[in-house]
């Protein structure tokens, strides 16, 4: 997730800013498509990584004793690799092979113009890439993370009840045995730490969704009904998504 945000900040945002400020593209057709590919790659990798993190937390919460054996470091590396492969197949392959290209006159003119880098896509690519890059991971992420919070909440309630009964029945023993009190405090601190981590991940996922959902809604609408969404709105919402890369380090 950090790598995707870093690449977005170093390789996508500066060229995007130059494109808007100068109102033209100064880096040629090849770099236009390569830059666009990196853009789609980073967005796809970001949300799919968040989706994988949600599944990881779900397994950690629901099957804590099996977690270490189920998710080893090698398996984690394979999953991360798969995320970037899928992201590459969604971005670089169709863009570099020109499968994404629209056939209307305005789009064709832009493709042949060295100073134009507007992202004109055909309907099939716009909808398919939005589904693979955003909507499917979003649905999985929301469903899994809602389950994670439900399970975590129930576990915290059980721990609170257990500690309450323990203190009520064995207060004098706890006072005499420092080790028992230390064990309870350690258990409570661990649960609070896990709960805080879940809240932080929830904020990251929520921020990402709020930043990118408007753009992907507009992206699909634009693919179905051309000229319905003003270009300025499209660019503004795209930059709202870019801003998300600056939020994660702060969160």
UniProtKB/Swiss-Prot annotation:
Principal localisation: membrane
SUPFAM superfamilies: Family A G protein-coupled receptor-like
InterPro entries assigned to the protein according to its UniProt record, in alphabetical order: ADRB2_rcpt, GPCR_Rhodpsn, GPCR_Rhodpsn_7TM
Residue ranges of coiled coil: none
Residues on Cytoplasmic side: 56-76, 147-200
Bilayer disposition of the protein: Multi-pass membrane protein
Localisation: Cell membrane; Early endosome; Golgi apparatus
GO cellular component: early endosome; Golgi apparatus; plasma membrane
Residues the record lists as Phosphoserine modifications: 172, 187-188
Record flagged with keyword Cytoplasm: no
Ranges of the Extracellular topological domain: 22-32, 101-122, 225-231
Post-translational modification: Phosphorylated by PKA and BARK upon agonist stimulation, which mediates homologous desensitization of the receptor. PKA-mediated phosphorylation seems to facilitate phosphorylation by BARK. Phosphorylation of Tyr-67 is induced by insulin and leads to supersensitization of the receptor.
Single GO MF descriptor: norepinephrine binding
Annotated TM spans: 1-21, 33-55, 77-100, 123-146, 201-224, 232-251
Keyword Transmembrane helix: yes
Biological-process GO terms, alphabetical: adenylate cyclase-activating adrenergic receptor signaling pathway; norepinephrine-epinephrine-mediated vasodilation involved in regulation of systemic arterial blood pressure; positive regulation of autophagosome maturation; positive regulation of lipophagy; positive regulation of MAPK cascade; regulation of smooth muscle contraction
Swiss-Prot/TrEMBL keywords: Cell membrane, Disulfide bond, Endosome, G-protein coupled receptor, Golgi apparatus, Lipoprotein, Membrane, Palmitate, Phosphoprotein, Receptor, Transducer, Transmembrane, Transmembrane helix, Ubl conjugation
Cystines in this chain: 32-117, 110-116
Pfam family, one: 7tm_1
Modified residues (Phosphotyrosine): 67
Residues with lipidation of kind S-palmitoyl cysteine: 191
Function of the protein: Beta-adrenergic receptors mediate the catecholamine-induced activation of adenylate cyclase through the action of G proteins. The beta-2-adrenergic receptor binds epinephrine with an approximately 30-fold greater affinity than it does norepinephrine.
Subunit structure: Binds NHERF1 and GPRASP1. Interacts with ARRB1 and ARRB2. Interacts with SRC. Interacts with USP20 and USP33. Interacts with VHL; the interaction, which is increased on hydroxylation of ADRB2, ubiquitinates ADRB2 leading to its degradation. Interacts with EGLN3; the interaction hydroxylates ADRB2 facilitating VHL-E3 ligase-mediated ubiquitination. Interacts (via PDZ-binding motif) with SNX27 (via PDZ domain); the interaction is required when endocytosed to prevent degradation in lysosomes and promote recycling to the plasma membrane. Interacts with CNIH4. Interacts with ARRDC3.
Family: Belongs to the G-protein coupled receptor 1 family. Adrenergic receptor subfamily. ADRB2 sub-subfamily.
Protein name: Beta-2 adrenergic receptor
């Amino acid at each position: 997730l950090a790598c995707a945000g870093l690449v977005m900040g170093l390789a996508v945002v500066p060229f995007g800013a130059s494109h808007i400020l100068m109102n033209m593209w100064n880096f040629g057709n090849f770099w236009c498509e390569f830059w666009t590919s990196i853009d789609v790659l980073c967005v796809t990798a970001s949300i799919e990584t968040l989706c994988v993190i949600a599944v990881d937390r779900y397994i950690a919460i629901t099957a804590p004793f099996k977690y270490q054996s189920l998710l080893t470091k090698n398996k984690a590396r394979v999953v991360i690799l798969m995320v970037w492969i899928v992201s590459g197949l969604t971005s670089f392959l169709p863009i570099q092979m020109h499968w994404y290209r629209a056939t209307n006159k305005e789009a064709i003119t832009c493709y042949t113009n060295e100073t134009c880098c507007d992202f004109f896509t055909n309907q099939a690519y716009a909808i398919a890439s939005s589904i693979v890059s955003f909507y499917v991971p979003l649905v999985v992420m929301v469903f899994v993370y809602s389950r994670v919070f439900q399970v975590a909440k129930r576990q915290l309630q059980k721990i609170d009840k257990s500690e309450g009964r323990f203190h009520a029945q064995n207060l004098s023993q706890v006072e005499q045995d420092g080790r028992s009190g230390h064990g309870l405090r350690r258990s409570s601190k661990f649960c609070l730490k896990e709960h805080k981590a879940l809240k932080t991940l929830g904020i990251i996922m929520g921020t990402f969704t709020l930043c990118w959902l408007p753009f992907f809604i507009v992206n699909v609408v634009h693919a179905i009904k051309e000229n319905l969404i003003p270009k300025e709105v499209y660019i503004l919402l795209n930059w709202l998504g870019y801003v998300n890369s600056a939020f994660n380090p702060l969160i």
